[in-house]
């Protein structure tokens, strides 16, 4: 039996609260069960030097965890004077995932920074960050349209992410911390709303997995992401 009695293909309750803060062009509090992440999207005119004069925009991301988002307090990375490897890996993943959702040429020379701050961690913080940041990004892009800076919203479609894994020999979707820490195989999958894969991060933590198990996990992820995208669209319709 999984925590909270979920079936193996069932994601945790997902909540997306838009306009959570007042200053950012897009802001969303995303909740995957007890995992809570504040995602904001901020717009700046101009692009990084390597893109100047090319007539296209850029999307970047930063990720961080509050000191007591976990069971025991972790010192802020700013206090340590440098970001950890995990942090850099996750923020690059978020940025790659969301760049796939936008027509950067149609965006023009604007930079959008996605800030994902974990308030409470119970597994799946990177997948929740991508899911929430996507909704914040839609709202930020719409502000550019409303302000007359873009003619149409350059969003190509929704992007969402979910974790899957093998726990106690069974393939499961959207792992909580207790499952994640005991998983034989742990995988994060990012997809477009029509099921195309943007990224797969998979590791055999305890036991190597087969090709057949990989296909099962990807199918499980697709089903979970379809459910999450429906929640994203419902949030945007409100």
UniProtKB/Swiss-Prot annotation:
Reactions catalysed: tRNA(n+1) + phosphate = tRNA(n) + a ribonucleoside 5'-diphosphate
Chain residues that bind phosphate: 86, 124-126
Keywords: Nucleotidyltransferase, RNA-binding, rRNA processing, Transferase, tRNA processing, tRNA-binding
UniProt cross-references to SUPFAM superfamilies, sorted A to Z: Ribonuclease PH domain 2-like, Ribosomal protein S5 domain 2-like
Cofactor: record remark: Can also use Mn(2+) or Co(2+) with reduced efficiency. K(+) simulates the degradative reaction.
Activity-pH behavior: Optimum pH is 8-9 for degradation.
Root EC class: transferase
PROSITE patterns: RIBONUCLEASE_PH
Notes on temperature effects: Optimum temperature is 40 degrees Celsius activity drops off quickly from 45 degrees Celsius.
Organism superkingdom: Bacteria
Record InterPro entries: ExoRNase_PH_dom1 (IPR001247), ExoRNase_PH_dom2 (IPR015847), ExoRNase_PH_dom2_sf (IPR036345), PNPase/RNase_PH_dom_sf (IPR027408), Ribosomal_Su5_D2-typ_SF (IPR020568), RNase_PH (IPR050080), RNase_PH_bac-type (IPR002381), RNase_PH_CS (IPR018336)
Coiled-coil stretches noted in the UniProt entry, renumbered to this chain: none
Pfam families: RNase_PH, RNase_PH_C
UniProt GO MF annotations: 3'-5'-RNA exonuclease activity; tRNA binding; tRNA nucleotidyltransferase activity
Enzyme Commission number: 2.7.7.56
HAMAP family found in the cross-reference section: RNase_PH (MF_00564)
Protein family according to the UniProt entry: Belongs to the RNase PH family.
Complexes and interactors: Homodimer. Has a tendency to aggregate into multimers.
Other notes: The gene in K12 strains MG1655 and W3110 (and also other derivatives of K12 W1485) has a frameshift mutation that leads to loss of activity, although the protein may be translated. Thus in those strains rph is an expressed catalytically inactive protein. Strains shown in this entry are derivatives of K12 MC1000 or MC4100, in which the frameshift has not occured and thus are active.
Name the UniProt record assigns to this protein: Ribonuclease PH
Lineage of origin: Bacteria, Pseudomonadati, Pseudomonadota, Gammaproteobacteria, Enterobacterales
Name of encoding gene: rph
């Amino acid at each position: 039996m999984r925590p909270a009695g979920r079936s193996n293909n069932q994601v945790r309750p997902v909540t997306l609260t838009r306009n959570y803060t007042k200053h950012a062009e897009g802001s969303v509090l995303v909740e995957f069960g007890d995992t809570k992440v504040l995602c904001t999207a901020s717009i700046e005119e101009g692009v990084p030097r390597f893109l100047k004069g090319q007539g296209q925009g850029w999307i970047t991301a930063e990720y961080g965890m509050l000191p007591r988002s976990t069971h025991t307090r972790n010192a802020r990375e700013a206090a340590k004077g440098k970001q950890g490897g995990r942090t850099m890996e996750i923020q690059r993943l978020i940025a790659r995932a969301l760049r796939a959702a936008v027509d950067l040429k149609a965006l023009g020379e604007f930079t959008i920074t996605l800030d994902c701050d974990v308030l409470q961690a119970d597994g799946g913080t990177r997948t929740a960050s991508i899911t929430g940041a996507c909704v914040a990004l839609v709202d930020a892009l719409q502000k550019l349209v409303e302000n007359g800076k873009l003619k149409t919203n350059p969003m190509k479609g929704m992007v969402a992410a979910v974790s899957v894994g093998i726990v106690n020999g069974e393939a499961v979707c959207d792992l909580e911390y207790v499952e994640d820490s005991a998983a034989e195989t742990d995988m994060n999958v990012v997809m477009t709303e029509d099921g195309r894969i943007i990224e797969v991060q998979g590791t055999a933590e305890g036991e190597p997995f087969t090709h057949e198990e990989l296909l099962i996990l990807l199918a499980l992820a697709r089903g979970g992401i379809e459910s999450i995208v429906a929640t994203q669209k419902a949030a945007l319709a409100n």
